[in-house]
């Protein structure tokens, strides 16, 4: 039930479903999750169940979710995960080719599956997310849980963003909890937001000047584990 509910919460939030709709969707998804040994293609199985339901409301959910569920992304694997091949290799999942209307939902579902699988299997992994500004990081989201809880389960994360302007205050709070922050030269419109994340108020004006003076390829690094140069001047030393 927890797996079905977690998946349906993400789908429901991204599609603005109400509690009753999420409950109906969860009931259908729970059946598929319980039968995933014989229904390995999870999304098509969910879509078929929704569209063949005796309930008109459930069939309506199937029609609304067909653009998402017609993509056979999740597949039952021998190691217990649905989409993540747990192995000592790098695996790249590119969702840019999917329609804009389902891209965020699909990315969050993948993150949820990886987080759940890695936590259950107790295998350390690192999840790198590019263009993270396109995803939700607020309280209760899967990416927020990866940031705030991941280290307890040996799950690391590397988050890459072109901008901080799109993040809400609670999302910036989540980002501030990351162990290491690395800022390359930002545009002038981003300098204040970067300085607020890098420095306490009493040191913020100095940080603004440092950010303005950065050259291409230089960056400011804030970390509990690495110290390069001094606190007043940027360093051109390579990060090993």
Question: What are these model-predicted stretches?
Answer:
Residues 1-155, 159, 168-171, 202-203, ...:
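P-loop NTPase motor domains
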Residues 164-165:
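Conserved beta-strand edge residues that scaffold enzyme active sites
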Residues 156-161, 181-185:
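Short hydrophobic alpha-helical runs that function as membrane-insertion/retention elements
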Residues 20, 170-240:
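P-loop NTPase motor core of the ASCE superfamily
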């Amino acid at each position: 039930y927890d797996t079905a509910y977690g998946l349906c919460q993400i789908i429901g939030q991204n599609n603005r479903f109400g509690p009753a709709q999420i409950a109906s969707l969860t009931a259908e998804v729970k059946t598929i999750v319980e039968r995933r040994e014989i229904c390995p293609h999870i999304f098509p199985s969910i879509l078929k169940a929704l569209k063949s339901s005796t309930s008109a409301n459930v069939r309506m959910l199937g029609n609304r979710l067909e653009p998402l569920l017609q993509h056979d992304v999740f597949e039952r694997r021998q190691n217990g995960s649905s989409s993540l091949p747990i192995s000592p290799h790098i695996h790249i999942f590119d969702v840019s080719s999917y329609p804009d209307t389902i891209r965020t939902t699909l990315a969050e579902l993948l993150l949820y599956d990886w987080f759940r699988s890695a936590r259950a299997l107790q295998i350390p992994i690192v999840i790198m997310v590019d263009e993270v500004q396109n995803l939700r990081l607020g309280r209760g989201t899967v990416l927020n849980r990866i940031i705030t809880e991941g280290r307890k389960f040996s799950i690391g994360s590397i988050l890459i963003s072109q901008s901080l302007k799109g993040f809400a205050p609670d999302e910036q709070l989540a980002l501030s909890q990351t162990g290491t922050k690395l800022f390359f030269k930002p545009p002038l419109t981003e300098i204040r937001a970067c300085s607020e994340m890098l420095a306490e108020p009493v040191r913020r004006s100095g940080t603004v000047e440092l950010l303005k003076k950065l050259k291409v390829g230089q960056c400011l690094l804030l970390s509990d584990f690495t110290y390069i140069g001094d606190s007043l001047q940027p360093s051109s030393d390579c990060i090993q």
